[in-house]
């Protein structure tokens, strides 16, 4: 049966190496590894069975990054916690378990456990003791410590290399605020603690695209979407909006425009929350509040009333030519990313 959430992007991370660090109780045979490889077929994806003891795991990872020289490191849960400490690389920490010792205690991880995925050494089970829990508490105390020795310039550079992604339905770890106290690039995605195809495609892939664009110094044409085109009379996304938005972000830099209502701060917050709820991670930091659309530099403006002084091409949403988002999709498909 065809999976509607898996789509391949051979042009993204082409010829590059992606390193994946798995979560607690998992292995390099995790389905996430094959999911990444399937999505980015021209990239090389590497992963390693991480030792149970955290100091050994970090030693292995520090050895491996020198060996494989990854262009991007992605870590999930425990792997996200380790990934934060691999300074100097572009990396994504997904639901990072920065309070691993407490998480183990809260979720009854003490005692005999079963490896969730096949390990290269053939082990099927392992034992979590109080001593091991203490080891994880100690390793998490090292998180963020490397930032303290950096100069302001080095810190700013390092912070631009790291993304934290947090599932809004994660009931296992809750480290968004802790992460945000050290790194500015933190976003939510719709999903639970464990990634599935949908949360990976909608939450992680857009960030990988941004990172690849930055690495390649790739400038995509800019599309502005005015918020007057987004919602129906009930406040829900208009028909085919999600389809159009997901198509556009694959080829363009897409920004949401909303009026800068100085006397209505609550509306500013409501507009941002709507975008996060319905457009999710791709809209993160891609909302522009402005009352002067003619001052914006861009290629396309989709608006119910496009500003005649906008320097690019205006598409009048709701007109006979662009009555619905389906007509907008057809227009941009014909352009082919131009």
Annotate each predicted stretch with a short phrase.
Residues 265-338:
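C-terminal cap/substrate-recognition subdomain and adjoining C-terminal extension
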Residues 74-84:
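Gly/Ala-rich beta-loop-alpha elbow adjacent to hydrolase catalytic centers
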Residues 71-75, 91-93, 162-168, 287-289, ...:
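Short, hydrophobic beta-strand segments that form beta-sheet elements in well-ordered domains
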Residues 185-222, 313-338:
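Charged phosphate-binding loop/patch that engages nucleotide di/tri-phosphates or the phosphate backbone
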Residues 5-67:
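Active-site catalytic motif of lipid deacylating hydrolases and related acyltransferases
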């Amino acid at each position: 049966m065809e999976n509607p959430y898996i789509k391949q992007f051979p042009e993204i991370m082409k010829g590059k190496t992606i390193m994946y660090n798995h979560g607690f109780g998992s292995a390099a045979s995790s389905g996430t590894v094959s999911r990444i490889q399937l999505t980015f077929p021209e990239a090389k994806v590497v992963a390693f069975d991480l030792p149970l003891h955290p100091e050994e795991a970090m030693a292995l990872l520090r050895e491996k990054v020198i060996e494989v020289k990854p262009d991007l490191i992605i870590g999930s849960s425990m792997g996200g916690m380790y990934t934060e400490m691999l300074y100097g690389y572009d990396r994504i920490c997904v639901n990072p378990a920065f309070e691993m010792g407490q998480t183990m205690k809260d979720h009854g991880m003490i005692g005999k456990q079963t490896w969730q995925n096949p390990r290269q050494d053939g082990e099927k089970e392992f034992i979590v003791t109080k001593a091991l829990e203490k080891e994880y508490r100690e390793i998490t105390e090292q998180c963020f410590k490397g930032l303290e020795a950096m100069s302001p310039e080095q810190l700013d550079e390092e912070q631009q290399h790291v993304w934290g992604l947090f599932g809004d339905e994660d009931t296992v770890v809750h480290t968004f605020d802790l992460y945000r106290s050290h790194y500015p690039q933190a976003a939510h995605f719709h999903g639970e603690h464990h990634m599935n195809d949908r949360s990976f495609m909608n939450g992680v892939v857009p960030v990988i695209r941004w990172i690849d664009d930055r690495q390649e110094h790739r400038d995509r044409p800019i599309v502005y979407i005015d918020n007057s085109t987004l919602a129906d009379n009930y406040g829900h996304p208009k028909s085919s909006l999600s389809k159009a938005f997901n198509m556009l972000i694959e080829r363009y830099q897409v920004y949401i425009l909303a009026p800068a209502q100085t006397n209505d701060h609550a509306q500013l917050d409501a507009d941002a929350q709507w975008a996060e709820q319905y457009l999710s991670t791709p809209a993160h930091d891609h909302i522009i509040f402005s009352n002067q659309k003619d001052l914006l530099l861009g290629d396309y403006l989709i608006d119910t009333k496009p500003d005649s002084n906008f320097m690019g091409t205006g598409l009048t949403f709701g007109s006979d030519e662009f009555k619905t988002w389906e007509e907008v999709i057809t227009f941009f498909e014909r352009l082919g990313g131009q």
